Every structure is written in C-alpha cells, then in structure tokens.
Regions:
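Bacterial Sec-dependent N-terminal signal peptides
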Residues: 1-23
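Conserved, mostly hydrophobic/aromatic
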Residues: 70, 103, 160, 230, ...
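Solvent-exposed loop/turn segments at secondary-structure junctions
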Residues: 75-78, 113-116, 166-170, 234-239, ...
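Active-site neighborhood of glycoside hydrolase catalytic domains
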Residues: 208-229, 233-335
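Aromatic/acidic polysaccharide-binding cleft in carbohydrate-active enzymes
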Residues: 323-398, 416
C-alpha cells in the first residue's frame, strides 16, 4: 500500500503543470542615468479583462538582421590617436566587443576621400590612367587599414562594405571632387554641376572606373580585409561642397549592367554590388534600375539614407524580394544631445519597420565638436576632447546600444501591434525576445505589453530608452 502511494504521488508530480514565475529583464537609459539594470518585472498570464498597449507576436517573423555598424573615417582615426594605447583600446572595445560593446559586425568605409577624410584624395589621381597603372591604396595603409585591423581584434569576423564619394576628378565633367561651390572648396561658379551626370559618360571612363573599383577590392584583400559589398556611389543626388558625384538613374543602370557587373564577374570577385547609397524618394528613379533585368543580374540589394527613409516602406512593398540596408544615419550638428538620440531611435524604427537588414551609424568617433574637413559639425557615438583627452559616450551611443547589444546578427525582427507605437521587437538566436522602447513624453508612462498568452506591466521614466528581455 505504501509503495502504491509513492507511485501515485510521483505520477501526480509528472502530470501536474509546472508553475513558476518568469521575470522580464529590464535595462533603461535616461539623460541622467545611462544603461541601468532595473529590478526584473513579473510576467503574468494574460486575461480578457486586461487592455494592452502593445502586443508582440513571436511566431510572426519579418526580416533577419545582418548586423549593426558605423563608418571608418580618417578623422575618427585621428581622434583616437589623441588617447594613450589603453584608452584607445577601451574605445574600440566599447564599439566592437560582443560582450561589452555595441557588437558592431557590419561596417562601412570610403573608397577615396569622403567629407571626414583629412582632405581630398583618390586612389588614382593620374589623369588619363585608364589602365590604372598608378592605382594605389598607400594612404589607406597608414590610416583606414590600421583602424580596421584594430577593430577586428574585438570583432574578427567584421564585415566591411565600401562606397566612393567621388571618382578621381579626371573622370568627371567639371574636373573637381565637388558639384557645388562653398566656403571650403575652390570650385568656380561656372564649373558647378547641379543636375544631370557629373561622371563622363564615355566607354573608356566607365570601363576604367569599373576597373578602379575592382582593384580597390583586390588591394584590400591583399591587406587582409575582405570587402563583402560595394555601393558604387554615395548619395548620387546630393549637391554640396565636399566630395560627391551626380548620377542619373539611366546612367547608374548603364554602369552597373554593362561595366561594374561584368568586370566584377570577370575578375571572379565575390564582392556584392548594391544600388546605393541612395538619397532619393522618387519611385520612378528606383524603377529605372530595379525593373531592368540587365542591371538586376548584378544587384544584391538597395542601400538607403536621408531622403530614402521617406520611401522605404513603399519600396519594400513593391520590390518584396530586394534586400534593403540603411547605409548612413543622419548626423546632427555636433550638439551630441538627448534629442539627437531620440531622433536616432526614430530613424532606426523607421528603417527597421521598412524592412532593412542592417543599420549603419555615420561617425563612430570624433574629436571636439565633430567638425569635418569641409566645416560641418556633426555628431558621433563617442566624443573625444583633444585638450583633456576625456572620452564621452554620447546619448546616441546608448540609444544604439539598446538595439545592438541584445540583437546580434541572425536575430529576426518580429511583428508587433497596438496603440503604443514607440516599440520594436526582435527574437535573437539565444531564444530571447527583445523589446526596445522609447518614451518621448516628459512624464512617466505605464505600459501593458502582451506576449502571446502572457503580459507584463511597466512604468517607464520620462524621456527614456528601455530594453526588455524575455527568455522564451
């Protein structure tokens, strides 16, 4: 009889549902307190009587996240040189380390000068060198390449993609790196190019430029850096005084289909070609290229920035199979403010809701007010004071960390709905649900968040970023 009782008791324990309290991990940031671990929140069973501000649907997966990153620029490397070796390593670790930093895994770099180079240069400034006899990355070997290798200490599998701001000036109609005059360049008014194509649309020049870009990829490979993708023109619609180049949609379609694509294939480069980085929101311009079978044979995806945010959702709906990437975060004006961080959250949510698989910040590190070589003060994730050597992690650093730290490459964005809109949800490879929120209000806000058959209630602080982590 006693033995029968024990068997019955064991059977009861095996069939009885397990009851335990599951908690939600909570990290928050305000302007006064950054990256603070709050007390865990209890996850409760959902009821029909409870109203919910947001509902998360873990089984409804959207795009897979390829990663997060920023851009390697010359002035960023110069800012790091202000620090001693130990402090410099700490900064790099806080950007790239997967356990302690932002876990950057997919980053950008320029091909030749951009507006955060020390000054103008290209990789072949010898006029008429169609065979690229004088092509050289010697300057990069002193600045950008060491910068990248230092980062790879903390992220060995770091993926790099690249884009030119301007071709060599001898390939351009006005023989200048810029298309618009300004107080920081020597372009004459009569040489401005304010519409049309700034690149010479001649077969010799187009062929040479395709070789120029392919040699860039090959040269970097020899220095131990694999460039997995090239976006062949930064902002082909921009008008400004720093390095740039105007292209019309038909000209872009032509160079991709007849020159870049065939050249990369002939050289057996595994590097992808992307249509980017696009700063335009007119669908007809996209259609010219994305509806071309000849160009689409070579295009791996579309990169968007600035005005691109206005069309990304429409573009994603129309071209559902085309991969999308956000390629440059909006840069501010060197204020390094909490408001800038809130704008960053807005941009990240906007692009992620539009289907991008990667998000790229602009300057990772800058000195002082973040002044470019062409006179524009801009923000960075990390600010270094040259005089005091003080390192400041800006509000945008923490806004970015609320996304990237718990959402590594391989995570999936998942569906969410409800009246509370300042929210993005992911499922990471560790089986964790990650919910990132922003409270823009000047007062605290209570939120009920439902996850399948459970929910939790939380009151988030005014002007705060919050990340909630639930083990599923």
């Amino acid at each position: 009889m006693k033995r029968q009782f024990k068997i019955c008791a064991l059977y009861f324990l095996l069939i009885r549902p397990a009851t335990f309290t599951q908690n939600v991990r909570w990290i928050r940031s305000t302007e006064q307190e950054r990256w603070v671990s709050n007390n865990p929140i209890e996850l409760k069973n959902a009821t029909a009587a409870t109203s919910y501000d947001a509902e998360i649907y873990p089984t409804q997966k959207q795009q897979t996240i390829d990663g997060w990153g920023g851009c390697f620029n010359e002035l960023g490397w110069d800012a790091l040189q202000v620090l001693d070796a130990k402090d410099r390593e700490t900064v790099l670790k806080t950007l790239f380390d997967p356990k302690e930093g932002l876990n950057f895994t997919i980053c950008r770099m320029p091909i030749g000068a951009n507006d955060y180079a020390r000054n103008w240069y290209s990789l072949d400034d010898s006029a008429g060198d169609f065979k690229m006899k004088y092509f050289s990355i010697d300057r990069d070997r002193k600045i950008l390449i060491p910068y990248i290798h230092e980062a790879k200490k903390y992220q060995p599998a770091l993926k790099l993609w690249a884009s030119p701001w301007s071709p060599p000036v001898w390939m351009k109609t006005n023989k200048h790196y810029a298309n618009k005059r300004g107080d920081h360049n020597d372009l004459k008014p009569e040489n401005e190019v304010l519409s049309g194509n700034q690149f010479i649309q001649d077969e010799n020049y187009l062929s040479a430029y395709a070789v120029y870009l392919s040699k860039f990829v090959e040269a970097y490979q020899k220095d131990g850096i694999n460039v997995y993708a090239v976006h062949f023109q930064n902002e082909p619609y921009t008008l400004n005084q720093w390095p740039n180049c105007l292209w019309t949609p038909s000209a872009m379609c032509n160079i991709i289909a007849r020159y870049l694509g065939p050249t990369f294939r002939k050289e057996q480069l595994k590097t992808e070609l992307w249509l980017g980085t696009w700063n335009n929101d007119v669908m007809a311009n996209f259609d010219t290229i994305l509806s071309s079978p000849e160009a689409m044979k070579y295009i791996a995806g579309v990169g968007l920035q600035w005005e691109g945010k206005n069309i990304i959702q429409e573009l994603h709906k129309k071209y559902t199979t085309v991969k999308l990437m956000q390629t440059e975060s909006e840069c501010g004006n060197g204020d390094f403010s909490w408001k800038d961080a809130e704008h960053l959250f807005f941009l990240m949510k906007k692009y992620l809701d539009g289907g991008v698989t990667a998000y790229t910040y602009w300057n990772m590190v800058l000195a002082d007010k973040g002044t470019s070589s062409w006179g524009w003060n801009q923000n960075a994730l990390i600010q270094i004071d040259k005089a005091s050597r003080k390192v400041t992690y800006t509000p945008e650093y923490y806004a970015f960390k609320h996304f990237s730290y718990f959402v590594p490459a391989g995570s999936s964005k998942i569906e969410s709905a409800g009246s509370f809109k300042e929210l993005v949800a992911f499922l990471n490879p560790h089986g964790e649900l990650v919910i990132v929120t922003n409270n823009l209000q000047d007062t605290a806000k209570a939120i009920n968040i439902k996850i399948s058959a459970q929910y939790f209630t939380v009151t988030v602080q005014p002007k705060s970023f919050n990340t909630f982590i639930v083990k599923l």
